[in-house]
């Protein structure tokens, strides 16, 4: 398997990289991956992840709910209830930050299409992109959405979107600088980019350490703080307009983390 080796910090270009911790893939493989930090700017990333063309199998599990939409188990049931509330909250956030009740929106990494469907129902013209064929099929069958594969991003007309959203997507994308540049090109002159990412400087991340579910190796390649996500935006011509917490996302991640800690304890007992 071909793996991505990072020798220079994607944010500042620095070469002073240090291993920070080792995390486990609790979803698909049980494999371990190292997290590295840039000693110059503090940016954190996962080292040695499979390259983009080969990472697909790490998403192919029913436990990866944003692609499978499974409702089995208490954790997934909670996810579905929380999502219903968050869909409305996200829609209100889009309209507040864009100062628009309708417009043209691009949802990148749309998953099974719930958010794109919500915005469509509110009168927005929606384009949606998703790398998972399984998730694209679900969105088409359940919502009638024409969800394009990820490669279609480069086929979209520049300067035509009032809003672009990436809900927990940026941390998955291998070509980070290229993505930021493309986002800037696709937006209208006064367009708004909304990016939601886990905060690896949060209380929960500090508390749980290597068990924190939002490290989600190897699917999460990049691990942002409020400072580093803002620095990436500034690097590519974006100005930070607002910052919003997503407490229900954090709550769900903490529940997954507790489950992971239980799994690790059980595995250690079996090993003994």
Where are these regions (language model features)?
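Conserved SAM-binding loop
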Residues: 3-7, 17, 85-209, 221-236, ...
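Short low-complexity, flexible loop/linker segments enriched in glycine and/or proline
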Residues: 34-35, 63, 141-145, 163, ...
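Short, structured secondary-structure boundary patches
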Residues: 39, 66-71, 147-152, 163-173, ...
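Conserved catalytic loop of SAM-dependent methyltransferase domains
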Residues: 24-29, 241-267
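Conserved small/polar residues in nucleotide/adenosyl-binding loops
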Residues: 270-272
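Conserved SAM-binding loop and adjacent beta-strand
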Residues: 74-90
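Short glycine/proline- and charge-enriched loop/turn segments
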Residues: 72-75, 208-217, 256-263
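N-terminal juxtadomain amphipathic helix
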Residues: 1-73
């Amino acid at each position: 398997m071909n793996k991505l080796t990072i020798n220079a910090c994607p944010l500042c270009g620095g070469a002073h990289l240090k291993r920070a911790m080792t995390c486990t893939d609790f979803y698909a493989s049980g494999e371990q991956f190292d997290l590295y930090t840039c000693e110059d700017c503090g940016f954190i990333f996962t080292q040695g992840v499979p390259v983009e063309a080969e990472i697909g199998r790490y998403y192919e599990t029913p436990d990866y709910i944003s692609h499978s939409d499974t409702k089995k188990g208490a954790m997934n049931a909670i996810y579905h209830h929380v999502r219903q509330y968050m869909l409305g909250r996200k829609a209100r956030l889009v309209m507040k930050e864009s100062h628009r009740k309708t417009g043209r929106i691009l949802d990148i990494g749309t998953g099974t299409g719930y958010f794109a469907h919500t915005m469509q129902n509110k009168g927005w013209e929606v384009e949606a992109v998703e790398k998972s064929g399984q998730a694209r099929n679900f969105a088409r069958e359940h919502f009638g959405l024409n969800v394009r594969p990820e490669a279609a991003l480069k086929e979209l007309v520049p300067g035509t979107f009032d809003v672009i959203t990436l809900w927990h997507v940026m941390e998955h994308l291998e070509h980070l600088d290229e993505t930021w540049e493309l986002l800037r090109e696709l937006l209208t002159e006064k367009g708004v980019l909304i990016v939601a990412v886990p905060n690896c400087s949060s209380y929960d991340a500090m508390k749980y350490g290597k068990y924190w579910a939002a490290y989600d190796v190897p699917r999460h390649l990049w691990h942002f703080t409020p400072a580093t996500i803002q620095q990436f935006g500034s690097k590519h011509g974006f100005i930070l307009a607002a910052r919003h917490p997503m407490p229900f996302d954090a709550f769900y991640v903490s529940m997954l983390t507790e489950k992971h800690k239980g799994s690790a304890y059980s595995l250690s007992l079996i090993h003994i």
